Amino acid sequence: MAHVVRIAYKTIYNCIEQGVLDIGVADLPDHGIRRRRAKETRGTFSHGRSIEDRPAEVIDRHTSGHFEADTVLSGKRKGQAIATFVERKSRLIIVKRLQGRDSTSMTKAILELANQLEDNLKPLTVDHGKEFANYKLIEEQARIPLYFAHAYSPHERGSNENRNRVLRRFIPKGQPIEEITDDELIQINWYLNSRPLKCLNWRTPIEIFLRNLRH
């Protein structure tokens, strides 16, 4: 009987870099996808609830309303950014413009989302970027817990990372967010949610999300 051995992405990359495996990074199926960040440029902090403490209903995707959140930046050090919120069950993505890359801008976006979705917004899974530093205020005012992924582990927020990669087809790195109009953001957001996905049995995120709202 065969046994399945699970190996972390980091272990594979370390073995390649050390020459233990006779292959290169380019030989990997997803070699164009970075599994770890070379350097975190946004600033970080180390507090908050661990992703390991998330309840089972968040992990198994059987319950709607659980979101992953992230920030999409341009190539500039300052200026606007985009907040992305991805619902884990339906893969629905909600895109919001941020006037800055700071915690105040992200806090405003999350509280706005909480006001819009009301009881349909449940725990958020995020990273330790400085834009989430106001997590205590968010938890208090939005009445939802925030769970933080481990450092340099974007795969722990895989739904968000995947949707962000598709978003980058429309907003490539280096393009100032200020150049994108509100109408263009709406159109991009609608396209992403209207596109059938294999993981949804070729249904669309908006279809699944709205169906869950009715039940």
Regions found by a protein language model. Give the residues of each.
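Short conserved beta-strand segments at catalytic cores or DNA/RNA-binding microdomains
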Residues: 72-94
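Basic, flexible linker segments flanking DNA-binding modules
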Residues: 4-60
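Short alpha-helical "recognition helix" segments of helix-turn-helix
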Residues: 1
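Acidic/histidine-rich, metal-coordinating catalytic segments
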Residues: 119-134, 152
